[in-house]
């Protein structure tokens, strides 16, 4: 048994596994409904509603929160040592993981729209920048992400109510348009799991 195996927390693996299963179940359920499946009208139909039900985003939120815990454990030694070389090495580990997940998730989204992998990669890239911050600053960043998302939605609703077009902000498809601007807005604001507000879970 290696040192990594001895120090690995099985609780995180269990949570990650349960969250992944939940994400797959909810995504596949939504896919079947879009293909004409019958959800029914009972209480379970409401609970497992992939868009408005109480479980609609819970598994994805747990998935991102567990990723944040994993980042804390991965970077703990480097942060505690204060060694810039160790910090840089861990930062590049996060960047590589983020780029891989971002690229794979981007192409997967062409086949299966709405997956979290695309945004999961963006979360790791954000974590590579943020992991050296103190807890209070991380809390400020997370709260700012949530408040920023709420402010954007409020502004868009207010503008639309006064007859202004807000589709450039809230609607778009980077996979179709191949636009860097659409890609940025998809990741930050209007995707299924954008950095605003989902960064609060990391």
Pin down the residues of each PLM region.
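Specific transmembrane alpha-helix
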Residues: 61-76, 117-131, 188-202
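Residue-level signature of transmembrane alpha-helical entry/exit and packing/kink sites
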Residues: 16, 93-97, 101, 138
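Membrane-interface helix-loop-helix modules in multi-pass inner-membrane proteins
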Residues: 89, 93, 100-130
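Solvent-exposed interhelical
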Residues: 126-144
